[in-house]
Regions:
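Active-site diphosphate/adenylate-binding microenvironment
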Residues: 54, 58, 148-182
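A glycine-rich phosphate-binding loop feature that marks nucleotide/adenosyl-phosphate handling sites
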Residues: 2-4, 75-84, 285-287, 309-316
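Conserved thiamine diphosphate
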Residues: 36-41, 45-49, 104-119, 123-140, ...
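Non-heme iron-sulfur electron-transfer modules
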Residues: 1-36, 98, 145
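Glycine-rich ThDP/TPP pyrophosphate-binding loop and its adjacent helix/strand module
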Residues: 180, 194-200, 209-226, 230-360
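N-terminal amphipathic, basic-rich helices that act as targeting or association modules
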Residues: 36-39, 44-87
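Flexible, low-complexity linker and terminal segments
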Residues: 1-5, 95-154, 310-409
Length: 409
């Protein structure tokens, strides 16, 4: 950090860049690969999260890919604090004035809250379809209007196509709304022309524990929502309490001697429905897999669940939080965290829906990984007699889980 006074001279430079240096995302396919994705304008920027936070890179990436049509239902927790603390928010708009719509609910009902947003959106779009069909059947609309309305109805679930058609429809109905009641109604509903991308964001405390019943209810609904679980393996915002995502051996509040039972496999549980897209990702370990999983989840016409590994200041990284991305890579390479995707659409093609993206771990590095984080290393200092047994159990659990995934793949 530098003193504010020393940086004031840069304000004019920043203003110049913000006002005159335009986005280059129209020059590339931002969804094609990792490099291209970073030409997209971030619609989540300058959050107040801890330095090196493992959560915010995922939120930023989603805003780059879908932010101009994104709706977010956010659980209470770290992600709600850095996303919506008065008087500022890191969510912003692009040059067209489009950006994410964000709202915050509680630990226990954030998924239901997001489902409600999706159901309301469905209802309003159904009303649009009804009005357009009435316009097509009426005599008050010109033939070219009817043609565009019919094209929208046939493509209303195609995000890019609805963007294209919205740019045609809005000026048409605005020009005719004083003469045509159908056009007036469509003009009033114009914000629903573009297919929205509904995201539900929460931490592991909300998703694995307090709000799990709601999460299960929402994915069981079959509705087209995307749930992002920012898995820090503790209740981060409330001070590092143990959750069902906390692995064996880790010290956390309410598990001061090291947790004694294994981590809940939320992702694998969700796959049992058979119609839920599920992915487990770690950006620092495999950026391409992260991008692919997020794109597949959003494109899947049903519920999706993405579980993202997020190093946290509560972990006590000995290398420092500036190395959080590298810590994710270490976690995957040693077998602590595993990368995989479950895509029900593949089963419809006669393929295995489960894809294990992690390579065979280097298990020799597992214990070293644990000792590189204070949440584990503290067990060795405070409970040396039990540390070896707990760390051995942690490694055995990780091997058991990886071997289970191998059998599915």
């Amino acid at each position: 950090m530098k003193h504010l006074e020393s940086q004031l001279a840069e304000a004019d430079n920043w203003t110049y860049c913000a006002e005159n240096v335009k986005s280059k995302q129209h020059l590339v396919d931002i969804k094609a690969n990792v490099k291209n994705s970073q030409f997209a304008t971030p619609l989540f920027e300058f959050s107040g999260a801890c330095s090196g936070c493992g959560e915010t890179p995922y939120v930023k990436l989603i805003s780059q890919l879908f932010g101009d049509r994104e709706m977010v239902a956010n659980a209470t927790g770290c992600s709600s604090i850095y996303s919506g603390s008065v008087p500022s928010t890191p969510y912003t708009m692009n040059e067209k004035g489009h950006g994410p719509a964000w709202a915050n609910s509680l630990f226990e009902d954030f998924c239901e809250f997001g489902l409600g947003m999706e159901l309301a959106n469905e209802k309003m779009r159904a009303r649009l379809v009804k009005v357009m069909n009435e316009a097509i059947a009426s005599d008050c609309c010109p033939a070219e209007y009817k043609e565009v309305f019919a094209e929208w109805i046939n493509n209303m679930l195609d995000a890019e196509k609805t963007k294209e058609l919205a740019e045609k429809i809005i000026p048409m109905v605005e020009a005719a709304k004083d003469k045509c009641n159908h056009c007036k109604q469509i003009a009033d509903l114009q914000q629903y022309l573009v297919k929205r991308s509904q995201w539900i964001i929460g931490g592991d405390g909300a998703s694995y524990d307090i709000g799990y019943g709601g999460l299960d209810h929402v994915i069981a609904s079959g509705k087209d929502v995307n749930i992002l679980v920012l898995d820090t393996e503790v209740y981060s915002n409330t001070g590092g309490q143990s959750s069902k995502a906390t692995p064996v051996g880790a010290i956390a509040k309410f598990a001061a001697a090291g947790k004694r039972v294994r981590k809940k496999d939320l992702g694998l549980m969700a796959t049992t429905y058979g119609y839920v897209y599920v992915a487990q990702i770690a950006m620092g370990a495999d950026q391409a897999q992260t991008l692919k999983a997020i794109r597949e989840a959003e494109a899947y016409p049903g519920p999706s669940l993405i579980i993202a590994y997020a190093p946290c200041i509560n972990h006590g990284l000995k290398a420092g939080m500036g190395k959080s991305q590298e810590e994710e890579e270490k976690a995957v390479k040693c077998g602590y965290w595993h990368l995989w995707r479950y895509n029900p659409a593949l089963e419809e093609e006669g393929k295995n829906p489960f894809q294990l993206d992690s390579k065979e771990p280097n298990w020799e590095d597992f214990q070293g990984f644990l000792k590189g984080e204070v949440r584990y290393a503290s067990v060795m200092k405070q409970y040396p007699a039990e540390a070896e047994e707990l760390f051995k159990a942690a490694e055995e659990n990780a091997k058991w889980r990886y071997n289970s995934y191998k059998r599915f793949g």
